[in-house]
Amino acid sequence: MKAWEQKYQEWISDFYHGELLFFAGFILILFRGMWLSTMFPQNRMLSLLSIPVASLLIGLKILLFDHYPVKQFLMLWVVLICTMLSCYFSHTVNAFLMILLVLGSKDIEFEKILKVYLVIVGAVMVLAFLASTVGVIENLQYERENKRLRNAFGIIYPTDFSAHLFYLLTVIFYIKRNTMKSIYYLGSIGLAGVIYYFCDSRLDSVSILILVGLYWIGNEIENASFVSRNIQKKWNVFWKSVGIYSVPIIAVLSIGATFLYRGTSTFWVDLNKFLSNRLSLGQNAYIKNGIRLFGKNIEMVGFGGTTETVLDYNFIDCSYVHILLVNGMAFFCILLALYVLCNKKNVKNLCFLYAIFAVAINCMVAHHIVQIEYNVWLLGIGINCSKVTRRIYESNDFS
């Protein structure tokens, strides 16, 4: 018996085993989400089974390898309970999976998470693209009013395909942040053009251009000899004082625009048309359902998975309005607070703040903010490893 106890103590004393538990659960959740976003045949039983299995793996990592002060531990339980209540009332699971991964990512090297994300999401994207081009799965094609053809390339909808590419690019840029070359910027601009041409996805094309612009301008300001120190200082001060609040600022603007929308105003009508009716759809959902503390199950009727005409389209695309109405005020506040905390922990890393800003802009129109198969950035909240974990990393050469 003592031998088993000794082996157990030795096992939990090595944080590497905690990493294995986390990444096993992370890969399972990530692969499930990616597979559901493709046109490949779906197995509902396996999809449902993957959630408790992944939760068990990550839960074991948290229980056996993570240590918190009492106040922080109680706060985490409040967050988890509020999230679970939100999922119960909204009949959704994405919020729970995101919070579970946020809690489980404690002391996990963030770039490892990004690289695993890049491999899994990239591999499924390539597989779906190739399968759709040779006819193994359907390449859904939609025709706009202007006769432009939109391709989904094996994903359930063209904008979901382009969104995957945008989020992959945010990860690639961050990983390559210290060795950025002109070819990366030019290639990304070209990708934005390709996405616009084949998918007619304005949002993700513009989001990629914003990402390229932030990285290019930021690198020029930081490294170019012709830029004065005064400009460098102002740039840094802006991002470290205002940039860390980019998500709540953009969330308030998005929700405010939705609630202030008036169908009798030319300005609001034109803006609503430019945003593909996002404002009117969001406002209608608010009037019909209201805002609740822990959310509500709102039936979403949208495009995707089929090319059949949808007559009663009713989908809340704006992430911030979506979270507020579906997941409730409690989880909405938790999410914004986590993003602020995440940015504050990475405040010295401007490239991290650039990525969050680009994602925040994208989420004004798209609904992917708590879908881990798209948005992995909130897991950066665990980037600051404890002293004990740092020593383990250094001794095992994990970097």
Q: What feature does the model see in each segment?
A:
Residues 2-33, 47-66, 71-266, 315-391:
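Hydrophobic transmembrane helix bundles of membrane-integrated enzymes that assemble
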Residues 269-327:
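Long extracytoplasmic/lumenal interhelical loops at the membrane interface
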Residues 393-399:
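Membrane-proximal cytoplasmic C-terminal regulatory module of class A 7TM GPCRs
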